[in-house]
UniProtKB/Swiss-Prot annotation:
It comes from Shewanella baltica (strain OS223). One of its GO terms (molecular function) is pantoate-beta-alanine ligase activity. The gene is panC. This is Pantothenate synthetase. The reaction proceeds by a bi uni uni bi ping pong mechanism. It is an enzyme of class 6 (ligase). The keyword Nucleotide-binding applies. It comes from the Bacteria.
Length: 281
């Protein structure tokens, strides 16, 4: 696998592939990779001739009191895992490469509406940071296809909306959430959990599953939500949000809506965990 922190190197290699009529898939990451990321790379390899990955801990998407400095950097292990999964080109830029004028002077991309709810309400500016860095990476790599995990459901919709609104010729593919045997969604932030917290953490998925089952049985949105919040608190969580939304727009779900998604974010110990369930009733 070729690794470079320089934009020109990435563009030169991609152009060489393009000159031969070959296709390119892209998987952007922040590193500290787990099996969910590796699944994205393997899926990417099945879609296109070549796979490009990136590792960049993006300061623009972290808030003032979030874990930017504490976010694990594990480049050697990540590189080995990416190579084994089929990535051929790895972009590892520094903040100075991506934001040479600094964050305050950086042109940014903002997707209105869908960026302002749920995680966007809890983490102001987060999705502006996500949209900006993903747009920059898309312009550098210029892939045919880009893959993202469904675990970050709101992020996936933000990126799909950005691509559609800006007429970017890139197919965005969401890949199913990869889970531990307990049902806990794999996340780089699971490493913050103590043994006791990790044992309790599957309650997040269990609460979401119970909400969906209740809705399908005719229970009200309010009833299933309050029951799920109580279960989370009993398990040691502090809920941030637990909401039922329209699966395509993330607007508040109405009783007549068929395409639904339950989205949750909750704190346990030092970790803020997110999960979701997309379903039709």
């Amino acid at each position: 696998m070729i690794t470079s922190a320089h934009i020109d190197d990435i563009r030169t290699q991609v152009r060489a592939w393009r000159a031969k009529g070959e296709t390119v898939a892209f998987v952007p990451t922040m590193g500290n990779l787990h099996q969910g990321h590796i699944t994205l790379v393997k899926e990417a390899a099945s879609k296109c001739d070549h796979v490009v990955a990136s590792i960049f801990v993006n300061p623009m998407q972290f808030g003032q009191n979030e874990d930017l400095d504490a976010y694990p950097r594990t480049l050697a292990a990540d590189s080995e895992a990416l190579t084994a999964a089929g990535a051929e080109l790895l972009f590892t830029p520094t903040p100075a490469v991506m934001y040479p004028k600094g964050l305050e002077q950086q042109t940014y991309v903002e997707v209105p509406g869908i960026s302002d709810v749920l995680c966007g309400a809890s983490r102001p500016g987060h999705f502006r940071g996500v949209a900006t860095i993903v747009c920059k990476l898309f312009n550098i790599v210029q892939p045919d296809v880009a893959l993202f995990g469904n675990k970050d459901y709101q992020q996936l919709l933000v990126i799909k909306t950005m691509v559609e609104d800006l007429s970017l010729p890139i197919e965005i593919i969401g890949v199913d959430t990869i889970r531990e045997d307990s049902g806990l969604a794999m996340s780089s932030r699971n490493g913050y959990l103590t043994a006791a917290e990790k044992a309790a953490a599957p309650a997040l998925k269990q609460a979401i599953d119970a909400m969906a089952a209740g809705i399908k049985q005719g229970e009200s949105f309010e009833q299933v939500t309050e029951q799920a919040k109580a279960k989370l608190v009993a398990a040691g969580f502090t809920p941030d949000y637990l909401e039922i939304r329209h699966a395509h727009t993330l607007e508040q779900a109405q009783n007549q809506d068929q395409a639904l998604v339950i989205l949750a974010a909750a704190y346990i110990g030092k970790a803020r965990l997110i999960d979701n369930l997309r379903f039709d009733r």
